Each structure stands twice: as C-alpha cells, then as structure tokens.
Amino acid sequence: MKLWGGRFTKETNQLVHNFNASLSFDQKFYEEDIEGSIAHVTMLAEQGILTNEDKEAIIGGLQSIRDDIRDGKLVFTEEHEDIHSFVEAHLIERIGDAGKRLHTGRSRNDQVALDMKLYTRKEIKEMEHLLFGLLQSLLKIMKENIDTIMPGFTHLQKAQPITLAHHMGAYFEMFYRDRSRLQDIHKRMNYCPLGSGALAGTTYPLNRERTAELLGFTGPTLNSMDSVYHNNR
C-alpha cells in the first residue's frame, strides 16, 4: 500500500522506495500499532463516526493480524513502506471496505507518535523491572557484607579501607538514580498524541480523553504541533 504519490503517473523508483521504507525497523511496533488502532476505532464507534458493525470487523481483523504475526504465519515483505501500511493493507485484504475506514480522523503523524510512545513506555517498564531486580541483588550483597573490609581506590591506588557494603552501595545509588530517571521519563511522556492529526487536529468530533483512557495514558497531549514534531528532537 502506497501512502503518497497519488498525483504520479509512474511507479516510484525502487531506490526511492527503499530509501523511504522503514518497515525493516518499525516492524517491531506491530503490537503497539494494532493496540492504538483498536483504541482508535473503539472511540470512533462510541462517537458515532463508525458503525458498531465496522468496529467489530476492524477489531477482529486487527486481532487476527496480530496473532498471525506472533505465530509467524504473516511475514513482513518489502512491498510495504512501513508497519502502518502493512497492517492496513492486510486488514483491507481480510475484511474489505470496512478496513479502509480504520484511518478515519487520524494521520500517519499522530499514529507514528503514538506507536513510539507505547513502545517506549513498554521498554521503560521492562528496564524498571530489571533495575529493581538489580537493586535487590545489590542490597542483599550489602547486608551480607557490612563488616567485609576491602581497599578503597583513588587514582588506581589503594587509598582508604572501606567495606564491601559501602563499595556496592555506591553502585546501588547510581542505579537507583537511573531508575528514578526512567520513572520521570514515563511520567512526562505518558500523554496520548492521537487526535493531533498531521499537525493541526481534525474536523471529526473525536474524544481524545477517551482514547487516552483506553490506552492507559494520563491524558491527551495539549498541543497538536508539539505532539507530532517532538519525534524529530
């Protein structure tokens, strides 16, 4: 599925297609892309923009695509430019015209921003979990070695006697700060960009608060331009 070039009379040069394509790396967003689309069409149906029949067909199609990718039954191919066109093309192939209404009230810009936020949020949670386990291990070592003496170094030279608990405690503090930074990032980025459109929103009567709620965000982003531009920073 081509996302642009409707005015062109010839096929895009293969080199240009390859240069623009991002499926080789954004395919890792397939779960987030589908999760966001399910929330989006749920909101559209609640707002009366889509029929419930279309909503159910789209959600069923998206879930089957997700399951087939997980099971290795659906393979990513170079004919699609990115994960969004890949999912949408297969959805239309499976459920027909209803699949063409998936993208109602949405732009690739706010869709990409959403996918990146959902993926980043998932990875932050995983890193937090791993850091918590590391902190627990360090704490255990510290408790077991309160009286274990070792040399403390400065300029690669033995300088003062310290305990192993004190030495490991330094790393505990460092990793604790790292975990706090991740928590801060999560707090600041946990706002939903859907509804921002290409840069200035949409005329469809979307319920951005509802979409944000369905996806577990604190709320919707406040400025549509910031929502879609900040990925370039």
Regions found by a protein language model. Give the residues of each.
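A helix-coil-helix interface module used to build multimeric assemblies
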Residues: 1-201, 205-214, 218-219
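Acidic, glycine-rich loop-and-beta core segments that form the ion-binding/anion-interacting portion
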Residues: 215-233
